[in-house]
Amino acid sequence: MIYLHAIDPIAFSLGPVQVHWYGLMYLAAFFSAWALGRSRILRGRLPGVDMDGFSDLLFYGMLGVVLGGRIGYMLFYAFETFLANPLILFKVWEGGMSFHGGLLGVLIACWLWARKHRLHFFDVMDFVAPLVPLGLGFGRLGNFVGGELWGKFTQAGWGVIFPHAPELADRLPAQIQAQYAAGALNQFARHPSQLYEAALEGVVMFVVLWTFSMKPRARYAVSGLFALLYGVFRFIVEFVRVPDAPIGYLAFNWLTMGQILSLPLIAVGLVLLAMSRRAPVLQPVLPAPAGVEAAK
């Protein structure tokens, strides 16, 4: 059944402050990363690091996601807008985050943290990779609730009509409701590409990576699998997703910026998986109990 998107992006209000679902999804993403990371730390999957160290890593990662995601969006998708008004970089409440920018931010943050703690960078990345997919899924759910980043038109029975899409922008909400009830808007149904990404980049990637990382793996393997899966899934979904308005298609009337940025991830993933064939395996070392650590 074709669905009319009518979700209020505002979850609730606290006086004059409006709390958006998108912000709550970010909180859910960081909480899931903390809970999953805690489980891995307690099983000794990052030797030499306790919960205090992991909390520090999570803080670095949060900064990397927010700063990298915002800067990446401006550079990759809204560069001309940024040049015209550089202060727009700080208007995060207006939306605009890039996964690829956020990934770059996390890589830099993890590199700094690994250097600070004298750990191998890819041991840290292999630890972090399984914590990320659920956060990606929450982010895509936030995109869906906000009615943004929709897909192309579809005749599929699960299509979604987005009232804020350009083809309906001149119609009043009451008109849209009446026309939807009469079945007069079915030709405007779109692929819920946000939900496709939530399922693939969130649920499927989490199940695969978490299961794969349950056993000790060779260095580079988990990171490589993450990069490969994300690159492939994102490249595929881009075929049914509307390209970003300021850019459109970059070549062949189908190649998008998201696909171009995903190709290096696929290549890096394959290289890392190949490197893992001759790399050492990091064996778990359970962290010392808090009381023992304090006695030292």
From Swiss-Prot:
Keyword Zinc attached: no
Residues reported in the UniProt entry to bind a 1,2-diacyl-sn-glycero-3-phospho-(1'-sn-glycerol): 140
The organism's place on the tree of life at top rank: Bacteria
GO cellular component: plasma membrane
Example of a GO biological process term: lipoprotein biosynthetic process
UniProt entry keywords in alphabetical sequence: Cell inner membrane, Cell membrane, Membrane, Transferase, Transmembrane, Transmembrane helix
Any Pfam family matching the protein: LGT
Function of the protein: Catalyzes the transfer of the diacylglyceryl group from phosphatidylglycerol to the sulfhydryl group of the N-terminal cysteine of a prolipoprotein, the first step in the formation of mature lipoproteins.
Name this protein carries in UniProt: Phosphatidylglycerol--prolipoprotein diacylglyceryl transferase
Organism: Xanthomonas euvesicatoria pv. vesicatoria (strain 85-10)
